[in-house]
């Protein structure tokens, strides 16, 4: 058997995410975030004559999956799609797929992307500022940090990083780049630290975490892509089909919760004796409170601490 590519990635909420889809052995399923292929592999174990379509825009994820899922690929049980999941509907349509039985999302950055210092995601490892999930796109963290005006940086840091020192950090960046371009992750992390009061530096967690998150979200338009994709997924689902979404920070969770609430709520006009079928909510929430990782999982998978799983079921087209 071929050796797998170095793509160490502990799958979060593995069983919960797939099991709550109530997989039909002959169904059509989508893993919108292939990553390390953990969810795909487990979902495939539940299929007999069904088929799985797995999306990822990261080339390394695809190379890893070609090895990890080699048997299922040979049996034509899975199709790997190199694309941003915001093109979910059109990519599936090209393959003749217009309806699916279930879909899962594991949002956020895969561990290997953080671990590969050359990708420029980590504030702990020296690398050129990059943060592109799709290596073919032009916008990178370097352009955001060096070219965006002060006001745009403040907006991004506050909106996507929820950092109360957004103005101070943006000002420090603006001053530094007038002297020379800010080129590396450590250079940026040190700048962020220099903009913060001493008491902030003593708090738990890395002081650059929120700002790096904000820049990453901007570079990859993560929230915009997630919103577009989840909306498309709901439309693609067959009646009784399910959608599972794992989020890792409050912005992703709020977005998912808002979309699910919008599709699962009906404002019934007063005096209406019976609700017509076409006025029923499109979705039914399977869990009102998010599913969290078990104590057992938290012991071996640090990434699971912030993970939240929300699941919904399609009730009507």
Curated annotation (Swiss-Prot):
Residues holding S-adenosyl-L-methionine: 37-39, 56, 85, 106, 113
A single cellular component GO annotation: cytoplasm
Matching InterPro entries: RsmH (IPR002903), SAM-dep_MeTrfase_MraW_recog (IPR023397), SAM-dependent_MTases_sf (IPR029063)
Signal sequence, renumbered to the chain: none
Gene3D superfamilies the UniProt entry points to: Putative methyltransferase TM0872, insert domain, Vaccinia Virus protein VP39
Principal subcellular localisation of the protein: cytoplasm
Membrane-traversing stretches: none
Keywords: Cytoplasm, Methyltransferase, rRNA processing, S-adenosyl-L-methionine, Transferase
Catalytic reaction annotation: cytidine(1402) in 16S rRNA + S-adenosyl-L-methionine = N(4)-methylcytidine(1402) in 16S rRNA + S-adenosyl-L-homocysteine + H(+)
Job description of the protein: Specifically methylates the N4 position of cytidine in position 1402 (C1402) of 16S rRNA.
Protein known as: Ribosomal RNA small subunit methyltransferase H
Taxonomic lineage from the root: Bacteria, Bacillati, Bacillota, Bacilli, Lactobacillales
């Amino acid at each position: 058997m071929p050796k797998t590519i170095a793509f160490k990635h502990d799958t979060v909420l593995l069983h919960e995410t797939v099991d709550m889809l109530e997989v039909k052995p002959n169904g059509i399923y989508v893993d919108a975030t292939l990553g390390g292929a953990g969810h795909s592999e487990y979902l495939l174990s539940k299929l007999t004559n069904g088929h799985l379509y797995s999306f990822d825009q990261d080339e390394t994820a695809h190379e890893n999956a070609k090895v990890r899922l080699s048997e299922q690929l040979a049996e034509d049980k899975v199709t790997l799609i190199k694309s941003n999941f915001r093109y979910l509907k059109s990519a599936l349509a090209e393959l003749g797929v217009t309806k699916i039985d279930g879909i899962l999302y594991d949002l956020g950055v895969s561990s290997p992307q953080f671990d590969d210092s050359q990708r420029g995601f980590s504030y702990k490892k020296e690398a050129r500022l990059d943060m592109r999930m799709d290596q073919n796109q032009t916008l990178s963290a370097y352009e955001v940090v060096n070219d965006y005006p002060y006001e745009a940086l403040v907006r991004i840091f506050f909106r996507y990083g929820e950092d109360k020192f957004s103005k101070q950090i943006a000002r420090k960046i603006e001053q530094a780049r007038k002297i020379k371009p800010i080129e590396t992750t450590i250079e940026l992390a040190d700048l962020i630290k220099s903009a913060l009061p001493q008491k902030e530096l003593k708090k738990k967690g890395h002081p650059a975490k929120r700002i790096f998150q904000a820049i990453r979200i901007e570079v990859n338009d993560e929230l915009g892509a997630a919103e577009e994709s989840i909306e498309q997924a709901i439309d693609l689902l067959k009646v009784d089909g399910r959608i599972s979404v794992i989020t890792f920070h409050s912005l992703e969770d709020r977005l998912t919760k808002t979309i699910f609430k919008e599709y699962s709520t009906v404002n019934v006009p007063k005096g209406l004796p019976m609700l017509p079928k076409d006025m029923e909510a499109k979705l039914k929430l399977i869990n009102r409170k998010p599913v969290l990782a078990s104590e057992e999982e938290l012991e071996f998978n640090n990434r699971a601490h912030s993970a939240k799983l929300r699941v919904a079921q399609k009730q009507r087209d």
